[in-house]
Amino acid sequence: MTAFRSICQAAARTSDPATPKVLSIHTVRAANSCLDILEETGCLRRCRCVFHWFSGSSDELHRAVQANCWFSVNEMMLRTRRGREYARQLPLAQLLTETDLPPHAGEPFSAIAIQESLERTIGAVAAIRRLNPEELRKTLATNARALLSSPLS
């Protein structure tokens, strides 16, 4: 956690509200500790914090949602009951997709594999949430643009 704290301190110190830094965070069994550090260092205020493949408790999920964190989901996450439930519960405005490719270090993958994985993820999330896949795709594209281009409010 020492390295994570140092990264968060540097990110918060150098982040510009007009073009905030984006932190992609994988919190394996440490969501509350990570949220504490993000809060203490100012990252929650000065950066865009994205939880990659979030698997913490429902209380931790609620805390991260309330802190305006973003969440990226992938097709592997959606294979678990918890992953599907979180994909259903997350506010649409804080939802992103990801691939988590390649599946193993050194394993080849292609742009087509990435596109297919994203399409499967969008289809699965649309089914879970009973949404039109095309409308969800548009919302996710809007979210990605906002994540990468909007100033902090």
Report the location of each language-model feature.
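Active-site micro-motifs of SAM-dependent methyltransferase domains
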Residues: F71, P103, A146
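Alpha-helix N-cap and loop-to-helix initiation/capping positions
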Residues: T2-A3, F109-S117
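Short acidic/histidine-rich active-site segments
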Residues: A93-A111
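Mid-to-C-terminal alpha-helical segments outside catalytic/metal-binding sites
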Residues: T14, A18, Q115-S153
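Conserved, mostly hydrophobic/aromatic
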Residues: A64, A87, D100, L136, ...
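Catalytic pocket-lining loop regions of alpha/beta-barrel enzymes
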Residues: M1-L96
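Surface-exposed loop/turn and secondary-structure junction residues enriched for glycine/proline
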Residues: S57, R79-R81, H104-E107, P151
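Ser/Thr-centric signal marking residues that sit
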Residues: T27, T99, T121
